[in-house]
Amino acid sequence: MSQTDASCTIAELPYRSVTDLVVLDFPRPEVALITLNRPGRMNSMALDLMKSLKQVLKRITYDHSVRVVVLTGAGRGFCSGADQKFTAPVPQVEGLTQPVRALRAMELLEEVILALRRLHQPVIAAINGPAIGGGLCLALAADVRVASTRAYFRAAGINNGLSASELGLSYLLPRAVGSSRAFEIMLSGRDVGAEEAEQIGLVSYRVSDDRLLDTCYSIAARMATFSRSGTELTKRALWGGLDAASLDKHMQSESLAQLFIALHTSNFEEAAAPCTEKRPTVLVDARGCATSPG
């Protein structure tokens, strides 16, 4: 598939009928690139864009040709959070009062955060610029974060006279950087630059702008070499570990996941075979099959 064939807006795909506010590319085999595409507003979280993103995520989780998803923003920003100058109508709120309309708007944003977490595929956030307010929340909902040198992060609710706690930020940020740093970042409303973000574990890597997507594609390509069930269950276990009430309960769920793969596939035996048979590993996520991985 050529680059021209592989790159298209969602609206051009008959089974993904949404707007060009979200652009879908397939830049590498088994890798999907989702780009927030309102660069003039630094990809702010207006409801029309978020509705489109939700629709894309809903579709792509069942696209079995995609093993890893990369999420980024067009232009100079990743996502600038709430847009105080541009608003879009709240969908499906006819006849509701203004307070209920506001609740529905927040529900839509919350559903996007949860959709990223629940996506079958791992999600890598390629943070190409500022991730502010809800944009920081969006980045934290990804499984892996890579930042360009021009990226920075801000829990902006506190700067806007509101609470810094929004869209799961007070849950996700302490788990990413620790409670003390999360308290300080959220209560101060200061900017966290890309270098500091890498130092405190907010992002895995800080790279130059021109290397950002290639770095993410390299990570994605490695992830895609492993079994689909192993990757999906590892993602579930990691998020489940953040929610776990105790080590004991979480170890039980991990053990069940390992047994599920061991009993229903030949992956474990296949992983050892190439050492003696001198051939590439072929993980098929099934027992007794000789087909290629899927």
UniProtKB/Swiss-Prot annotation:
Q: Which SUPFAM superfamilies match?
A: ClpP/crotonase (SSF52096)
MF terms (GO), sorted A to Z? enoyl-CoA hydratase activity
A Gene Ontology annotation in the biological process aspect, one of them, is: fatty acid beta-oxidation
List UniProt keywords, sorted A-Z.
Answer: Fatty acid metabolism, Lipid metabolism, Lyase
Matches recorded under Gene3D superfamilies: 2-enoyl-CoA Hydratase, Chain A, domain 1, Lyase 2-enoyl-coa Hydratase, Chain A, domain 2
Q: Does the keyword Signal apply?
A: no
Q: Which InterPro entries match?
A: ClpP/crotonase-like_dom_sf, Enoyl-CoA_hyd/isom_CS, Enoyl-CoA_hydra/iso, Enoyl-CoA_hydra_C
Q: What is its EC number?
A: 4.2.1.17
A Pfam family for this UniProt protein? ECH_1
Catalytic reaction list: a (3S)-3-hydroxyacyl-CoA = a (2E)-enoyl-CoA + H2O; a 4-saturated-(3S)-3-hydroxyacyl-CoA = a (3E)-enoyl-CoA + H2O
Q: Which family does it belong to?
A: Belongs to the enoyl-CoA hydratase/isomerase family.
- Job of this protein: Could possibly oxidize fatty acids using specific components.
Q: What name does UniProt use for this protein?
A: Probable enoyl-CoA hydratase echA12
| Species lineage | Bacteria, Bacillati, Actinomycetota, Actinomycetes, Mycobacteriales
